Amino acid sequence: VLGLKSTGLSNFVQSAGEHAQKVAPQTMLHRGICETYEAGTAVWSTVCGLKLAGQSEIEPNNEATQAACRIFSTTLDVLESNEELKREVFGPCSIIAAADSLEQMLTFARGLEGQLTAAIHGTPDDLREFAPLVRVLERKVGRIIFNGFGTGIEPCPSMHHGGPYPAASHSFFTSIGTGSIYRFVRPVCYQGFPDDCLPAPLQNANAAGAMRLVDGTLTREGK
C-alpha cells in the first residue's frame, strides 16, 4: 500500500494496526500455504526500517492452519532498497509505505512486475491529480480499481482477471468472467479453401445462423 507521507497517512497506519489487533486468525487452504506465509512475514520482520504496526492479538490455532493478520509500515525508500519486501507473501498481511512525492511513486510503479490488480483510493479530484500514475498502472496490471478491492471478482462480460507476466502467462486472457472461454481456444485461418471443405460455421450458407464477421460486417446472414 503506497501513500504520500503525511499526517493523514500516519493516522491511517495507526488505525490499520489497531484494527489488525482485533482480526481473528483465519484458516488457510492448507498447511504449506500457512507455513509459507509465516516464513515470509518472519523474513519481513528482520528488515531494518520495517515496523510492525499491528497484528492479531488472538493466538492462531496451528492445527487448523490459521494465520494471524499483520500490518507493517515503512518508507518507500526502504521498500525500494529491499528485494525481500518486493516478493509476494500470500496471506492476511500488508506493507504500508510512505512516499516523499508523486514522482517517487511513479518511479516505483514503473519498476513493478506484472500484477493482476491495482487499487486507487481517494476522491475524483485525487484521481485526476494522479492521472500519471493511472497511465503507468495501465501497463502493469490487468484491472485498475477505484475505491474498491481486488478480491471482489464478478464473473461478468466486462471482468478481466489477468495481467502482464508474471501475473498471467498471457495478458490478453481472463480466468474469470464470460471471456474466460477464450483461454481454451485459438484462432485458425482457412485460406483458399473450397466452401464445402470449411467447418460448417464458416461455410457461406451459415446454416446455424451464427454471428460472423464477413467482409468487416457483423451478420447472421448466409449466402
State each model region's role.
Residues 18-21, 25, 42-49, 139-142, ...:
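Generic surface-pattern signal
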Residues 2-116:
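NAD(P)-dependent aldehyde/semialdehyde dehydrogenase
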Residues 208-215:
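Charge-patterned, long linear interaction tracts outside catalytic cores
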Residues 84, 163-164, 207:
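Generic signal for short, ordered secondary-structure residues
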Residues 64, 102-201, 218-222:
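C-terminal core of ALDH-fold dehydrogenases
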Residues 1-5, 31-39, 58-62, 124-126, ...:
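A glycine-rich phosphate-binding loop feature that marks nucleotide/adenosyl-phosphate handling sites
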